[in-house]
């Protein structure tokens, strides 16, 4: 999936899929991430691992997409968050809702 601001590479698996996000996830591009998550769910995925290592910007619209997927029953795990993504997750108070794989500190 490609947008001028964000690109999401998807590796489908069973029961989880990995989404590698590149670029900026904001109010204008969060729909790309939302569509990738929906496609994974529609494909039978029960968990998504979202790699945010190459995210140069993420705002609350991007976190909202991840949070709503988790609230809706999909397992959501954040992997390799960029420094900015890690900070935004911490500042938004979403460390419990969006666990970071292999990480004990956010902020």
Please report, for each region that a protein language model flagged, where it lies by residue.
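STAS-like cytosolic regulatory interaction modules
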Residues: 1-107
């Amino acid at each position: 999936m490609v947008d001028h601001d964000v690109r999401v590479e998807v590796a489908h698996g069973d029961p989880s899929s990995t989404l590698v996000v590149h670029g900026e996830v904001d109010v204008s591009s969060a729909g790309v991430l939302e569509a990738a998550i929906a496609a994974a769910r529609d494909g039978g995925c029960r968990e998504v691992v979202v790699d945010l290592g190459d995210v140069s910007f993420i705002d609350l619209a991007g976190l909202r997409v991840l949070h709503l997927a988790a609230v809706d029953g999909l397992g959501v795990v954040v992997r390799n968050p960029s420094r900015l993504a890690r900070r935004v997750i911490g500042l938004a108070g979403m460390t419990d809702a969006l666990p970071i794989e292999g990480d004990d500190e956010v902020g």
